[in-house]
Regions:
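Acidic, low-complexity Ser/Thr/Gly/Pro-rich repeat segments typical of extracellular/periplasmic
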Residues: 2-170
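Sequence-level preference for short, compositionally simple segments enriched
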Residues: 168-475
């Protein structure tokens, strides 16, 4: 097997510090579970990073977890936690945890770490993901790769076989470009890592068209506008789910504000306020409990984005606004505590469109002029199951002037537990031909609003009523 090219090219300069390395072969390479990939400082020969390919990337089967608390608190401090100064897998709080025998990297300051794929094979190319935040500006590095890493590979065992130099200085200003070829950063994560926590200054991240196979996680960010060059041209995706990156054994996640965060999404913003995302696609490549996008925070706005997930394709916690979006999922397609306001958005779901978990302190999910497209016979609008003795009696879902396609006549269900206070309200629903839907067979828990309920309808058409008078619209 012959090496055709590398990225960076040998002795190439002006490389982003968040670069993903690439080797192109003359045939599709076979990755072995042995050998090392090592990165050294060219001038000092100091080891900078090491990937041990004998370590599996992450779990491939579900783990049976003991009963755990949902409400374990989590401290969102602004700390400079990276792979350079902290061992991935360190505990940020006191809880029992078994040793982690998988690949781990710290992303976005999450010291517990994420399982990741150090090498991803794409056709005849091997994409090599280093541990995050280890390369520095103004340095030259060389790469050594054991011949055992790939079948039929001669290896790279000398200093000038694969070397490159990073950009001389960190980009300045408040606007950064993500681009594989000529950007300030190679990855979305790299650009966001460059933005300080809790900033009052507005920052802009512009993403050029391309495929970005990366797990994105950031926390404590404020006032960032993330814009893709085009919705269909920018794809940010990763193979992640609850199996591959499960919550700790004795902790459950995201049940209340300030509790331990999940690690199973492809793109996750955590304790973030005033974030705008537009004109891009986020996607998880795995099935199961697997969010394409997971949002924790306040005053976050999304426009013209495509979210592709499996179960829980979108988890949305805290006041958030969605306009002209597409959300594809495989059941409980929208999960979370809310409140969330959706306008002119299309939902495609193989199972129930949502499982709402809001409490009485805030609204749930409200949809105005949206499209619900059921992809199988079980695509009810909402289900409210009993979750091991836990239910959400104040759940709220309101549909106003929405189009429903292949949604069961019952509309809502299964509904378990106390539902007397649930608000499952609907007004003006029509089919794809514009005809009024016959709602005579709707679940008795649901309420069909009439024209005489105009005051209620007008309130729910106002995002401020749903998200709060202090919600800051950024679109």
């Amino acid at each position: 097997m012959k090496t055709i090219s590398t990225y960076p090219m040998n002795h190439q300069s002006d490389i982003c510090i968040d670069v993903t390395l690439m080797i192109e072969f003359d045939t599709k390479p076979v990755l072995n579970q042995k050998g090392f990939i090592r990165i050294y400082d060219y001038d000092t020969d100091e080891l900078v990073d090491e990937l041990d390919l004998s370590i599996p990337s992450g779990p491939t089967a579900p783990r049976k977890n003991p009963e755990a608390k949902y409400t374990t608190g989590y401290q969102y401090k602004s700390e400079n936690i990276t792979n350079k100064n902290t061992k991935a897998g360190s505990l940020s709080m006191e809880y029992r945890s078994s040793p982690d025998p998988y690949q781990l990297t710290i992303i976005g300051g999450f010291k517990e770490g994420f399982h990741f794929y150090p090498v991803i094979i794409k056709d005849d190319r091997a994409m090599i993901q280093l541990h995050h935040n280890l390369l520095e500006y103004g340095h030259k590095y060389y790469v050594l790769i054991d011949k055992e890493v790939f079948d039929g590979f001669d290896g790279i065992d000398y200093k000038d076989g694969f070397c490159f130099s990073t950009k001389k200085e960190r980009p300045i200003g408040n606007r950064f470009v993500v681009d594989k070829n000529h950007g300030d950063f190679y990855t979305v994560q790299g650009a966001i890592d460059n933005i300080p926590d809790f900033s009052d200054v507005k920052y802009f991240v512009d993403i050029k068209n391309g495929e970005y196979e990366e797990l994105v996680y950031f926390r404590n960010k404020r006032n960032i506008v993330i814009t893709g060059e085009s919705k269909d041209g920018v794809l940010i995706h990763y193979a992640n789910n609850e199996v591959f990156n499960p919550h700790p054994e004795y902790v459950k996640t995201n049940e209340k504000v300030g509790t331990f965060p999940s690690r199973r999404a492809a793109f996750f913003m955590d304790n973030c306020h005033g974030i705008v995302m537009r004109d891009l696609t986020v996607k998880t490549d795995l099935h199961g409990q697997a969010e394409g996008l997971l949002v924790n925070g306040y005053d976050n706005c999304f426009e013209n984005i495509h979210i592709i997930g499996s179960g829980d394709a979108l988890q949305t916690n805290g006041p958030a606004y969605y306009r002209n979006c597409i959300i594809d999922g495989e059941g409980d397609t929208i999960l979370g505590r809310g409140p969330a306001f959706f306008e002119n958005t299309t939902l495609n779901s193989k199972g129930a469109f949502m499982w709402i978990r809001n409490g009485k302190e805030n609204h749930g999910n409200v949809f105005v002029n949206c499209m619900f497209n059921g992809l199988d016979d079980d695509a009810t609008i909402v289900r409210l199951p009993d979750n091991k003795g836990i239910s959400y009696p104040d759940s709220e879902c309101v549909l106003i002037n929405c189009t429903l396609n292949h949604v069961p006549d019952i509309g809502y269900g299964p509904i378990e537990g106390d539902s007397k206070k649930a608000r499952l309200w609907e007004y003006g629903s029509k089919d794809i031909h514009g005809n009024e839907i016959d709602v005579i067979h709707r679940n008795t828990v649901a309420r069909i609003l009439k024209d005489e309920d105009r005051d209620i309808i007008e309130k729910y058409m106002d995002y401020h009523y749903v998200l709060g008078d202090d919600f800051k619209m950024s679109l």
